[in-house]
Amino acid sequence: MNIKKIVLGIAGFFITGCAAQLPPPDPSFAATRPVATPPPQPNNGAIYHAGYEISLFTDYRARQIGDVITVVLEERTDAEKGSDTAIDRDTSYSLTNPTLLGSGVQFNTPNWLPLASNQDNSLEMAVKAKGAFSGGGDSSQNNRLNGHITVTVAEVLPNGNLVIRGEKVVTINHGNEYIKISGIVNRRDIKPDNTVSSLKLADARLAYVGDGATHEANRMGWLSRFFFSRFMPF
């Protein structure tokens, strides 16, 4: 009976550990709440109460802190880069034997380098060096991000532009997908349905990352990362 309880306890521990947990929000992309302004006290007996009206002509597009706005993600980038490098170096240096009083200078000092290798122990010598290096690389990258994310207005700039930010976290199969975005929106770029294209964002910061088993499966091991790092001499 005790063994059965221990086994059930261990199984429950592992099942609890495998349960997906929602990660805490990133403070840099946290939603901004509007400033709470208490409505005026209602006047009992009156038909109209200030602060509770609904205007038929109000523009419901985002315009103040805390308002929500939907960003239509339409990101697509294509980049290509190539480089070729070639270096050749050829150096030669020669020294003729000096003459003294019409005859060449000779030294009778065998086994001294480089004099021992020269003919007649003279000072005449020649040095040649040659080196070559060539290298090349090509890189191409294609990215596409489509979707929608609703964020909040964090700040209204003096010129009327809106600073927006927000994030979306989706947990699927013990893995989390993060979509984070921030930027500056011109009010004139906001459509009547309160949406704006991500192509219209200034100073845009977009991130689409994930974690969990699927994310870890796409990562190289530490030994593979070493062979592809800059510390690998070959």
Swiss-Prot record:
Superkingdom per UniProt: Bacteria
**From its record, what is one biological process in GO terms?**
bacterial-type flagellum-dependent cell motility
UniProt key word Membrane: yes
How does this protein sit in the membrane? Lipid-anchor
Lipid modification (S-diacylglycerol cysteine), residues: C18
**GO CC annotations?**
bacterial-type flagellum basal body, distal rod, L ring; cell outer membrane
Where does this chain mainly localize? membrane
- Which residue numbers carry lipidation of type N-palmitoyl cysteine? C18
Q: One GO molecular function term?
A: cytoskeletal motor activity
InterPro entries assigned: Flag_Lring (IPR000527)
Q: How does it assemble?
A: The basal body constitutes a major portion of the flagellar organelle and consists of four rings (L,P,S, and M) mounted on a central rod.
What protein name applies here? Answer: Flagellar L-ring protein
**What species was this sequence derived from?**
Nitrosococcus oceani (strain ATCC 19707 / BCRC 17464 / JCM 30415 / NCIMB 11848 / C-107)
